[in-house]
């Protein structure tokens, strides 16, 4: 590999999940030996109202998720679930359940299917 990243962030424009890279299950690519894979620093981006890799209304939550995910020791006091619920209540007037918050931060593999087909 020309690059050896410390962290890999997977967008929702792909069906790939962290375990696909960690278990080297992606066709045509060998992820073994990469620093991020060895450290298990492979993460799927959240999926709120839109794919969070691009600027969207969910961008503040994406940045908070990135900070907490990449620097957990510095953001240990941040309750991401509570912040997400507060954000959705303030911005949209919507009260999210724990299950809805979980789906934002652990999007299903199928969430990337439409985007993967569009390429």
PLM segments and residue spans:
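Binding-cleft/active-site segments that stabilize strongly anionic ligands or cofactors
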Residues: 1-60, 69, 74-76, 81-86, ...
């Amino acid at each position: 590999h020309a690059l050896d990243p410390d962290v890999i962030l997977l967008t929702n424009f792909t069906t790939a999940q962290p375990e696909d890279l960690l278990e080297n299950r992606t066709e045509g690519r060998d992820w073994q030996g990469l620093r991020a894979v060895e450290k298990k620093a492979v993460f799927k981006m959240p999926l709120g109202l839109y794919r969070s890799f691009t600027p969207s209304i969910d961008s503040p939550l994406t940045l908070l998720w990135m900070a907490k995910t990449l620097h957990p020791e510095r953001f240990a006091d941040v309750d991401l679930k509570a912040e997400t619920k507060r954000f959705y209540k303030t911005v949209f007037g919507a009260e999210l359940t724990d299950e809805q918050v979980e789906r934002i931060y652990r999007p299903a593999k199928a969430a990337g299917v439409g985007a993967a087909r569009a390429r």
